[in-house]
Design a protein with these regions (language model features):
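Conserved lysine of the Walker
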Residues: 361
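Conserved phosphate-donor/acceptor-positioning beta-strand/loop module used by diverse small-molecule
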Residues: 452-472
Length: 520
């Protein structure tokens, strides 16, 4: 019997289980109705306060759920992987049994014929893809998300094994083989064949760095399927669930490749500021040199993630009809074009934004950063944040006078420049956000840019005194300790630079940001 016939028979055998699970009387609580959600590899049945996940009897290029034994193993694997991180969601693995009377039951006596993961239900509007559509991914929630991902990666088992980066080869190979189909389905033309060649070249060129990061412990048992639909808000905190369970090679990966899926998902949805904030907060701690240098891999990782989404869409195209087929073809085209754009970012540059306290430096820096350089935008290095890291202080803790002494100020500027010197060679842009009151402070970033061979832009923000005073008075929970007295002292003793671009920052932040964009 052919493989296709075996798979058809497996699907036919499972049809009775699916019909059983659609009946309200099949469940202990007898819900009024049963809902159903279908994905490539699973059917999820929504019954009252619980959800039951059934692995579909399918065999695809990247997964094999064709027998009950394989479905049991993968259910147990998914439960073991996700329960530690989402204990409030994952309840147990449960058999669908057939009794002596031939009837199917949940967890009843008789022979197991299929397997389910029993989960707590949650409101759909708590999924992060729904929060994104509703415009509810604010800065505070993005920070929580970055911290949740960082905790997940910190707790993940390290795999220092030679299969990485070799395991990326088949993934890239599958993408390359799919390119002609993507060209045809998305009506792009022959452009994706050139992309396929470039993707292979990047993998070859990055082998040494990929291996070095593996040896440094940055290849771990990651989530593997980290996008917005697999994150839910539980008790006000992001909860990662549905980690990839069917192929260890797809999950034993570089932590930055894991994060890249989430960054790409945000970027593809047009949430550029959110993607930028996520990456910046993920790296807001003091990172090791190998972590910074790994940023050179990010364009490749992001591009590969987008190309894989195009390939997965191509797999589903034969089953789509009518308007759904046209929509899927458009989505494939979007992902393919995004993959191509992500692989070849603009070159790096160094930008210094100076000005007295209250001129809006940090707000403007965050506003323009997503539009600058490699996706998801320029790294913003802020002196107030570096000062707190240097002194081990939290964001709500007011620093003492010694933190602002000349030696401390010089040390803060050195930290800014050291981090910029680590980031710029990876191809990413950097924005330095500091007052830059002293001439020697302004000379240092320019000298760094010249040493690294990247363009430099110095911007000096100016605003009326009353505007600056109003802004510092309105700050809440900000990293800066500056108040009205600081602003007044700065006004008395600061001479603006003559060789930086002066920008009027008295208007709203977006208007000031528009002025800076014209300089870029």
């Amino acid at each position: 019997m052919s493989r296709a016939a075996n798979i058809r028979d497996a699907a036919a055998d499972q049809a009775a289980v699916i019909a059983f699970l659609m009946l309200p009387e099949s469940y202990p609580d007898r819900p009024a109705e049963v809902g159903r959600i279908d994905t490539h590899g699973a059917a999820i049945f929504l019954a009252g306060g619980l959800a039951y996940k059934l692995k579909r009897a399918v065999k695809l290029a990247y997964l094999d759920f064709s027998t009950p034994e394989k479905r049991k193993a993968v259910c147990e694997r998914e439960f073991a992987l996700n329960r530690p991180h989402a204990p409030k969601l994952y309840r147990r693995v449960l058999a669908v049994t057939r009794g002596d009377d031939g009837a199917l039951r949940l967890g009843g006596p008789g022979e197991p014929v299929d397997w389910l993961i029993e989960m707590e239900r949650f409101a759909d509007d708590r999924l992060f893809d729904r929060l994104a559509v509703a415009g509810r991914l604010d800065a505070a929630l993005i920070e929580k998300l970055a911290e949740a991902v960082e905790r997940f990666h910190a707790a993940a088992p390290v795999f220092n094994e030679p299969r990485w980066p070799a395991s990326l080869g088949p993934i890239v190979g599958n993408v390359v083989r799919a390119m002609s189909g993507i060209d045809q389905a998305a009506r792009i033309g022959a452009g994706m064949q050139g992309y396929a060649t470039a993707l292979q070249e990047r993998l070859y060129g990055h082998r040494a760095l990929l291996s070095e990061r593996r040896d440094a412990g940055l290849v771990r048992r990651c989530h593997g399927d980290l996008h917005l639909k697999n994150i839910v808000l539980i008790d006000g905190a992001p909860c990662l669930f549905d980690a990839l369970e069917f192929d260890e090679d797809l999950a034993r990966i570089d932590v930055l490749y894991d994060l890249a899926f989430l960054l790409m998902d945000l970027w593809h949805r047009g949430l550029k500021a959110e993607a930028h904030a996520l990456l910046n907060h993920y790296f807001s701690r003091d990172a090791a040199d190998i972590e910074w240098r790994g940023l050179a891999l990010l364009p490749f990782f992001l591009s590969l993630r987008a190309a894989i989404r195009a390939m997965v869409g191509l797999d589903g195209l034969p089953l789509a009809e009518g308007g759904k087929r046209a929509a899927l073809a458009a989505e494939i085209r979007d992902y393919a074009q995004l993959a191509e754009a992500l692989l070849s970012p603009a070159p790096p540059m160094l930008i210094a934004i100076g000005g007295l306290s209250g001129t809006g430096k940090s707000t403007v820096a965050r506003a323009i950063a997503p539009d600058i350089g490699a996706t998801p935008g320029a790294f913003v290095l802020r002196s107030d944040v570096e000062r707190r890291l240097m002194h081990g202080a939290g964001s709500a803790e007011r620093l003492g006078a010694d933190a602002y002494a000349p030696e401390s100020r010089n040390a803060v500027y050195s930290r800014l420049l050291d981090k910029a010197a680590a980031i710029l060679p990876t191809g990413h842009c950097v924005i330095l956000d500091a007052v830059f009151r002293e001439p020697h402070q302004r000379e240092r970033p320019k000298a760094l840019a010249e040493r690294l061979g990247v363009p430099f832009l110095g911007v000096w923000l100016e605003a009326p005194q009353e505007r600056m005073l109003a802004r510092v008075a309105a700050r809440r929970g900000d990293a800066s300790d500056a108040d009205a007295s600081v602003v007044l002292r700065q006004l008395e003793s600061t001479v603006p630079p003559s060789d930086w671009h002066k920008v009027d920052a008295s208007d709203a932040a977006e208007e000031t940001a528009s002025k800076l964009r014209t300089l870029l």
